[in-house]
Regions:
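Conserved segment of the helicase C-terminal RecA-like domain
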Residues: 44-49, 53-87
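Charge-dense, extended regions
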Residues: 234-237, 243-356
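Conserved helicase ATPase core of P-loop NTP-dependent helicases/translocases
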Residues: 1-23
């Protein structure tokens, strides 16, 4: 602490302070006006922590100077771009968005409101963008490095728990660990990721236990609490279906029995529970390490759910990301039936649209979906639409629209962004060759500026 004070005191001789691994999170030296990078780190988390040491406002400090003595390759520059891009409100930072941010000097982050400006020369921009295009950021070496840096930051001898990722602002994206492939095998869970990177001192779970862990992990981030509350009841020793229902009902405002029935159906289908003669039983032998792992997973999922939906008035959060199976789960449909782009339920119509069409798709699947303005989205129905579907569209009271730019990137399926509700107008028949209908969906909420730039809609 004395060294920190001397560094900021103009009457002291101390001008520069060197340190290894102790000037990251939790250090506050607002008078620092220069940050030097002398050791390589490929962790965007560590980079942001170290950069943050110089970004505090202070008397007679108009700006901070960053000297990066190891930035001698564009690979390093890409890591810096990733670190800055992670400050975006967009939870999915795919290449298209990252390249857009680089081209525009990260203006969409709104850092200028805090007196922060970023300038990259044109030649460097093109080199960085070329590197972004050629690099696979979902490769195991990237994610393993993020994991190891986080573990070192926590100074924990064992693997970090699920809740460790919830409790640190500098944690990597845990859900990303659950979605990647290591070799030809998908991780499916945090446990699967840890096994894939050969983490030491892992508990050994049976195939039945792993199947339960994988299904519960597949529900993250939660769009409803029911499944996790059922499992929590089982871990607490409750097995009676009627008492479990009563307990869950107490915890969920506006509880509906059909929601719990739907959750139980797919918990059983996902091999997480067994239901017979009014009793519910957890799949997998009840062992201490297994139950401890599940409890940690439940705490993570439910804490994250409470943080996201504490003040929610609607089923879906505006401008947030959802997988198609999550939407189907929320509206009590089969989450496995996710190969369609349109669903109808209780007078509502659910539309899933992609803006960039995969070149490998058949022509009749390359729908002409696009933004006409920030509050009007053009949507094309399925080809050779049936009279029944056309009638359902005409009868729809409102349309809930989910949009994504690309379907997948580097082997990872990307979610949709929920852009809100709207209504169908201006149906146009006969303007396509495949017998579809073009509509304008007039949205109740126009796209915010950041999403306009993300979706690259131009007036």
């Amino acid at each position: 602490i004395r060294a920190y004070n001397d560094l900021q005191d103009e009457n002291q001789k101390l001008e520069i302070l060197f340190a290894v691994d102790i000037l990251n999170e939790g250090v506050d030296i607002p008078g620092v006006n220069m940050v030097l990078f002398l050791r390589p780190t490929e962790s965007s988390t560590i980079f942001l922590q170290q950069l943050g040491r110089g970004l505090r406002k202070y008397t007679n400090k108009p700006y901070v100077t960053i000297l990066d003595f190891i930035g001698n390759s564009y690979k390093r520059s890409v890591h810096i771009a990733l670190a800055l891009g992670s400050l975006s409100r967009n939870s999915i930072l795919e290449k298209k968005l990252l390249k857009f941010m680089v081209r525009n000097d990260f203006k969409s982050l709104g850092l200028s409101d805090y007196g922060v400006e970023i300038h990259i020369d044109d030649l460097s921009k093109e080199e960085i963008i070329d590197k972004i295009e050629s690099e696979n950021f979902n490769r195991i070496n990237y994610l393993k490095m993020d994991y190891q840096n986080f573990k070192a930051y926590l100074k924990t001898p064992s693997y970090p728990s699920h809740m460790d990722y919830m409790n640190s602002d500098y944690a990597p994206n845990l859900l990303k660990f659950m979605k990647i492939k290591i070799g030809a095998k998908k991780t499916n869970s945090y446990y699967g990721f840890l096994k894939g990177i050969e983490e030491e001192n892992l508990p050994v779970f049976s195939e039945e236990q792993i199947a339960c862990i994988n299904y519960l992990s597949s529900l993250l981030p939660l769009v409803r609490e029911h499944e996790y509350l059922v499992i929590r009841n089982l871990l607490e020793g409750e097995t009676s279906l009627s008492r479990i229902e009563a307990n869950v009902q107490e915890e969920i405002p506006g509880f509906k029995p059909e929601q719990l029935e739907h959750a139980l159906r797919f918990l059983e289908d996902g091999m997480a529970v067994k239901i017979e003669e009014g009793e519910v039983h957890l799949c997998g032998e009840r062992e201490q390490e297994y139950e401890a792992y599940l409890q940690d997973l439940l705490n993570y999922g439910l804490t994250q759910y409470d943080a996201r939906y504490a003040d929610a008035q609607d089923d879906f959060l505006l401008w947030q990301d959802y997988r198609q199976d999550q939407v189907l789960l929320k509206i009590l449909e089969n989450p496995k039936h996710n190969q369609y782009g349109t669903y109808y339920k209780n007078g509502n119509m659910y539309v899933f649209a992609g803006l960039k069409k995969d070149a490998s798709l058949d022509d009749h699947l390359k729908y002409n979906d696009k933004f006409l303005s920030p509050d009007v989205f053009q949507w094309e129905s399925i080809a050779r639409i049936s009279a029944k579907d056309e009638a359902l569209q005409r009868a729809a009271k409102r349309v809930l629209v989910f949009v994504r730019k690309v379907s997948a990137e580097n082997g990872i399926t990307l979610p949709y962004t929920y852009i809100g509700t709207g209504h169908l107008e201006n149906p146009r028949k006969g303007v396509t060759k495949n017998g579809s209908i073009l509509y304008d969906i007039h949205m109740d909420n126009p796209l915010p500026q950041e999403l306009q730039e993300d979706f690259q809609w131009m007036e």
